[in-house]
Amino acid sequence: MLSYTPLANNEPSDHKALIVYLYNAFKQKDYATMAKCYHSDAYFRDEAFELSGKEIGAMWHMLCQRGKDMTLEFSVSEQAGNITAHWEPKYSFSQTGRFVHNIIDAEFEFKDGLVIKHIDRFNFWNWSRQALGAPGLLLGWTPLLRNKVAKMAMTNLVKFMEK
């Protein structure tokens, strides 16, 4: 497990280092360290989840546990004090066994040296056709499938957190 101490100040370079640290922990599937990168009042959103607080750490725990074959490449950028990341996980989707290469862009906001807001954006149709096959290809652009996937993801997270 990587050791982690919150950074001393809120300078952008420290924020960039925190995000590099977050994704390096993800590469190691070190969900406990990842959770420590987030403020207790943090907010996270992507195409499948809208989470806050401890739910974020639980999501990373679930994804690390289920993503046994996951590999990850990432880059972190800083422009005008704004920190963004581009990351590309490759993994077998646990529900279908299908290979997924997702391309994600992330934006971050910080409070007290930790992530307070994390927004991930990716092309849901591209993801759904890889993860789900024909149903994703045909319906991945519709709100119907997007909502179904989000509901299923949240149900899985709630069950995971109850363990």
Language-model segment annotations:
Residues 19, 23, 38, 60, ...:
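Hydrophobic alpha-helical core bundles mediating ligand binding, dimerization, or RNAP-core interactions
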Residues 31-83:
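A solvent-exposed, acidic/Ser-Thr-rich amphipathic alpha-helical stretch
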Residues 22, 34-35, 42, 56, ...:
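Hydrophobic pocket/interface hotspot
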Residues 14, 55, 100:
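Soluble or luminal CAZymes and related metallo-dependent hydrolases
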Residues 1-30, 36, 154-163:
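Short, low-complexity N-terminal intrinsically disordered segments enriched in polar/charged residues
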Residues 2-3, 64, 78-163:
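A beta-strand edge to alpha-helix "cap/lid" segment located at domain peripheries
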